[in-house]
Amino acid sequence: MKKYLALALIAPLLISCSTTKKGDTYNEAWVKDTNGFDILMGQFAHNIENIWGFKEVVIAGPKDYVKYTDQYQTRSHINFDDGTITIETIAGTEPAAHLRRAIIKTLLMGDDPSSVDLYSDVDDITISKEPFLYGQVVDNTGQPIRWEGRASNFADYLLKNRLKSRSNGLRIIYSVTINMVPNHLDKRAHKYLGMVRQASRKYGVDESLILAIMQTESSFNPYAVSRSDALGLMQVVQHTAGKDVFRSQGKSGTPSRSFLFDPASNIDIGTAYLAMLNNVYLGGIDNPTSRRYAVITAYNGGAGSVLRVFSNDKIQAANIINTMTPGDVYQTLTTRHPSAESRRYLYKVNTAQKSYRRR
């Protein structure tokens, strides 16, 4: 009971904290938020380990939807990178019933992340008439799953034919794994094309870049969260990118979590921030390809860190970049940027953007 209580106490705090992943604006309050959020996430992971066992900690992330129910004894895990859905339970009584209920709810859940608390065991998943996973999963007869009857039949089939169990030394873990369709990534991307096109026209940002950022940040997971509290499809942080965009639009404060979990709003804010990087923070870079490389890297690590790769003086940095070929700028950012994550990020986004340009 104590460990369940600990999780109940942690969950509200997790929702209230926020930090940053992008941008160069740091202040004391942000540092406190960052440290506090990281500590709380560590405590959350520790308590999951106490319940599930060593090496059995699974927590929601940018490309992983993870929802616990049944006093944290049942969980649904969608890996949007691998294209797998794993439903597991450690319930000591009627584990099949717990799995069946979780399978049906996961298959039929909607796409409203603001209504689901990923850090509590509250069963707040509502069955939707237009399930988020519709078309990304097919049942044993090869049909997409929209209605509860088909989801229930598929759950029964899975429990009869694919139920597995394993022991971690302390508990028996029962599980069922569902493979998503091979083109699940494209299926998710297609859901947001209209929103991407609208934001592209509004801010003058290439559609292929927006899609590449979304793929790299979240694999088109609208429930995406990170340990740095970046939220939604484009992993926007309230107090940095969100605040910058609001200020540029004449709004005070920062966008709320529910606002950033709304796909259209998230894409709008993320695209507006890309436009700010391109037109304001890195506007001194003349060559559009060189500037695109800088913008991509800055979306991950901040404009200041990009310019400092070339010079501590921002104006001089832009001047140096303007004497280089785009290929040299790319090579420099992917080899000399101090952040390994940012170096890899440019490669990933640039590669993804090429694939969207060919479509």
Curated annotation (Swiss-Prot):
Residues 1-16 form the signal peptide. A lipid is attached at C17 (N-palmitoyl cysteine). One of its GO terms (cellular component) is cell outer membrane. The keyword Amino-acid biosynthesis does not apply. GO terms for molecular function: hydrolase activity, acting on glycosyl bonds; peptidoglycan lytic transglycosylase activity. The keyword Metal-binding does not apply. Its EC number is 4.2.2.n1. Belongs to the transglycosylase Slt family. Murein-degrading enzyme. May play a role in recycling of muropeptides during cell elongation and/or cell division. This is Membrane-bound lytic murein transglycosylase C. The gene is mltC.
